[in-house]
Amino acid sequence: MNNTVLVTCGATVSFPRLVETVLDRSVTEKLKVLGYGRIVIQYGRGFSDTFLQLVEKHLGLFTEKKSCGIKVLDKIENLKVISVDGIEICGFEFSHDIEKLIANNIDLVISHAGTGSILDSLRVGKKLIVVVNDTLMDNHQQLIADKFEQQKLLWSVHANTEELLRALDRSENEELLKIDNTYNKQFEKLLYNVAID
C-alpha cells in the first residue's frame, strides 16, 4: 500500500461533500484494496476543524502524527497528519506547490471540477477523477467535466460513494489519454472547445 491519492477541493469554495465522500469507509476500504496507503486532502481555507470532525465521524478515533514524510507537504503550516484504520490521511488548506506535489508524489487525483485543478493534473499525466460540485449556482463544472471526459482525459462523477467507487474501479481498468504538457495546437484547440461549448 505505497500509493498516494490526492483529493483537491480548490482554494476558494469549500466542498464538504467531496471530503465526506472520500472519507466514507467504503471508499477508504476500496482505496486500501487498490494499494493506496495515503490520502492527501486539500480541503480549502477555514475547514481544518470540520475536516478533523469528518475524519472522526466517518472513520472513528485517530492518532495525529507530526509528519507525513512528503517534503512539499511537511512545509505546509497547519498540516494535519492522521493515522486511522491502516491508512494515513494528510489534510491541509492550500499549497502553492500543488502541481509539484502531484507530479512527484501522487498516483491518482480526485479533484473538484475547477479548470485550474483539472489542468494541474493533466499537465503531469496523472489519472484523474473529477467530482462535480452541483451545489454551485450554474453548471459550468458539469460542462467542463463532461467535455474533458468526452475527450477521454478524465472520469467525471458526482459527490456520492457509488459513483466514486465505480470511478475507482475504472481507474484501475481503463486507460486515459495523455496530453503533451508543453504548448501545442492540440491542447489549445481542446481548451477552446471546452470554453465555447
Curated annotation (Swiss-Prot):
It comes from the Eukaryota. GO terms for biological process: dolichol-linked oligosaccharide biosynthetic process. Keywords: Endoplasmic reticulum, Glycosyltransferase, Transferase. It is found in: Endoplasmic reticulum. It is an enzyme of class 2 (transferase). InterPro entries: Glyco_trans_28_C, UDP-GlcNAc_transferase. Its EC number is 2.4.1.141. Pfam families: Glyco_tran_28_C. One of its GO terms (cellular component) is UDP-N-acetylglucosamine transferase complex. One of its GO terms (molecular function) is N-acetylglucosaminyldiphosphodolichol N-acetylglucosaminyltransferase activity. Heterodimer with ALG14 to form a functional enzyme. Involved in protein N-glycosylation. Essential for the second step of the dolichol-linked oligosaccharide pathway. Belongs to the glycosyltransferase 28 family. This is UDP-N-acetylglucosamine transferase subunit ALG13.
